[in-house]
Regions:
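A short, surface-exposed alpha-helical micro-motif characterized by mixed small hydrophobic
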Residues: 220-222
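Conserved ABC ATPase signature
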Residues: 153-157, 161
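ABC ATPase NBD coupling module
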Residues: 19-22, 78-95, 113, 121, ...
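A short, proline-enriched helix->beta-strand linker immediately N-terminal to the Walker B motif
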Residues: 172-176
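ABC ATPase "signature
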Residues: 235-239
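Conserved ABC transporter NBD signature motif
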Residues: 37, 69-80
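Short catalytic/signature loops enriched in Gly
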Residues: 17-19, 24, 240-303
Length: 303
């Protein structure tokens, strides 16, 4: 079985503070997982703010270098220090979709100009009809068309439309892997499922694998094949998405599920969270533990 992405014992430390108050923050600690080329999947990274999920995504994209460990895409180490040709080839294979579509586009630049520059850069097209055809093909994949976006600026589109345009731009090089960092968190609630269903169709219909980064357990349950749950930089549970979220084993995983508003307490605005569970999950942060396999194929951090 060929490996598309291989994350091996990756850690990332940041030095924070000034000369007299310097401290090291362990943003990601010894993370490992892999994606296969055989079966496209949506692999989800779940965690609250500060869990390390975005830092891990940035390292996969080559925007940050690991402090230790190795990330390989199709057998080659991901590095921000490669030649321009190597970086361009990698960018054509691994494309990002960022959280806020309004920050992904220059407000003074037309959407079709962005799409055109991406088309010229990665597909090396020069003829007007060929460029327009490639842009329209990418837009059709996300439920838009070139006629709908041509001549329009970002502020003239809704958040949902703009995020679709951002995904279309990412699809122009025909990448086998997308890294989507909280792609629905800045989109109106009424439009979120349309973006989630779009990601699902990219996997099912186009064969694109997606690393989906979120704190939203509901969408993770809906679209994920496998997932990891991160707490303070460490993977605490990994496995089949339904198995893990139906019956989470690690205290932090159980806490995440329990913190979702229950139907019984929704009217009172209460969270179904056990204080003892909160304390246990917090106490375990300082203990490294080890990942142990279970009969259903999942890995759970034990202490």
């Amino acid at each position: 079985m060929s490996t598309l992405l291989d994350v091996r014992n990756v850690s990332k430390q940041f030095t924070m503070g000034g000369l007299l108050s310097r401290r090291v923050v362990n943003a990601v600690q010894d993370a490992s997982f892999s994606l296969s080329t055989e079966t496209p999947e949506i692999f989800t990274i779940i965690g609250e703010s500060g869990s390390g999920k975005t830092t891990l995504a940035r390292m996969i994209l080559g925007l940050e270098l690991p402090s230790s460990g190795d990330i390989q895409f199709r057998g080659k180490t991901v590095s921000a220090k490669g030649s321009r040709a190597e970086q361009l080839a990698f960018m054509g294979n691994v494309q990002p979709v960022f959280q806020n579509p309004f920050e992904a586009f220059n407000p003074l630049k037309r959407i079709d100009r962005y799409l055109e520059s991406t088309t010229r850069r990665f597909l090396k097209l020069t003829q007007r009809d060929d460029i327009d055809g490639a842009m329209d093909e990418a837009l059709q994949k996300v439920g838009l068309s070139l006629a709908e976006v041509k001549g329009r600026y970002p502020h003239e589109m809704s958040g949902g439309q703009l995020q679709r345009a951002a995904i279309a731009r990412a699809l122009i090089p025909n990448p086998p892997l997308l890294v989507a960092d909280e792609p629905v968190s800045m989109v109106d609630a009424s439009l979120r499922m349309s973006i989630v269903n779009l990601l699902k169709s990219l996997r099912d219909d186009l064969g694109v694998s997606i690393i989906y980064i979120t704190h939203d357990l509901a969408t993770a349950y809906y679209i994920s094949n496998r997932l990891i749950i991160m707490q303070r930089g460490r993977i605490v549970e990994m496995g089949d998405a339904r198995a893990v979220l139906d019956n989470p084993e690690h205290p932090y995983s159980r806490l995440l599920k329990a913190s979702v508003l229950s139907t019984e307490d929704a009217g009172d605005g209460k969270l179904a969270t056990d204080p003892a569970m909160v304390k246990l999950a917090s106490d375990l942060v300082a203990r490294p533990g080890t990942l142990e396999s279970r009969g259903d194929g999942r890995l759970v951090r034990v202490y």
